[in-house]
């Protein structure tokens, strides 16, 4: 078993085209011995957003703090908040935005993309 102290993990700015004011911690990943899944913690600052994008794998999301807008494959926005979870199917376009006044945080669990090759 591997136990990490999440407060000690750095949260660098996401350097992906289309992302703005987003930081991400990798809480559990290959460096921890997890060959199949990766757990990430995203922080979307007020006015920030992830890119509108898709993947060829499914993933699950749990809202940790604050509120945000989950944009679906049709471009429709859905307000989401702490206590909610989302499932994103392979190929679904999606995005997260934060038009609110506090940081929006969520966990995102994905398969290890290297294993999908």
Task: Explain the meaning of each model-derived region.
Residues 1-36, 117:
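A short, N-terminal "cap"/entry segment at the start of jelly-roll beta-barrel domains
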Residues 41, 60, 87, 102-117:
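A short hydrophobic beta-strand segment most commonly corresponding to one strand
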Residues 43-45, 55-70, 109:
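Short, conserved beta-strand element in jelly-roll/cupin
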Residues 48, 56-57, 76, 92-93, ...:
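A generic "binding-loop/recognition-motif" signal
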Residues 51-52, 70-71, 88, 94-100:
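Short beta-strand His + acidic residue motifs that chelate non-heme Fe in jelly-roll/DSBH
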Residues 74-90:
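Short acidic-glycine-tyrosine-enriched beta hairpin
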């Amino acid at each position: 078993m591997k136990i990490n102290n999440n407060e000690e993990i750095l949260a660098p700015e996401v350097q992906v085209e289309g992302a703005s004011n987003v930081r991400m911690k990798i809480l559990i990943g290959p460096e921890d011995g997890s060959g199949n899944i990766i757990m990430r913690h995203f922080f979307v600052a007020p006015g920030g957003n992830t890119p509108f994008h898709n993947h060829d794998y499914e993933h699950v999301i749990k809202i940790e703090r604050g509120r945000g807008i989950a944009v679906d494959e049709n471009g429709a926005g859905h307000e989401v908040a702490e206590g909610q979870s989302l499932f994103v199917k392979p190929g679904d376009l999606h995005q997260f935005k934060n038009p609110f006044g506090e940081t929006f945080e969520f966990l995102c669990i994905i398969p290890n993309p290297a294993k999908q090759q």
